[in-house]
Amino acid sequence: GKVEFQGKKTKFDSDDERNENGAAGPVKRAREETDKEEPASKQQKTENGAGDQ
């Protein structure tokens, strides 16, 4: 299922740029859900051991 998560991450990555445009609300929420499902994404974003949480 890593491939599926990677695809999702790419989608969020694209939305991340739009998120700065003023869509931080929905995008941030979706990202949080993804982070919970794939800790690897969180690790790459924070690299602060967030994957442990």
UniProtKB/Swiss-Prot annotation:
The modification Phosphothreonine is found at residue 10. Interacts with DDX15. May interact with RUFY1. The modification Phosphoserine is found at residue 14. Keywords: Acetylation, Nucleus, Phosphoprotein, RNA-binding. One of its GO terms (molecular function) is RNA binding. The modification N6-acetyllysine is found at residue 8. Residues 1-13, 29-40 have a biased composition (Basic and acidic residues). This is Lupus La protein homolog. Signal peptide: none annotated. It is found in: Nucleus. Binds to the 3' poly(U) terminus of nascent RNA polymerase III transcripts, protecting them from exonuclease digestion and facilitating their folding and maturation. The gene is SSB. One of its GO terms (cellular component) is nucleus. Residues 1-53 are annotated as: Disordered. Phosphorylated.
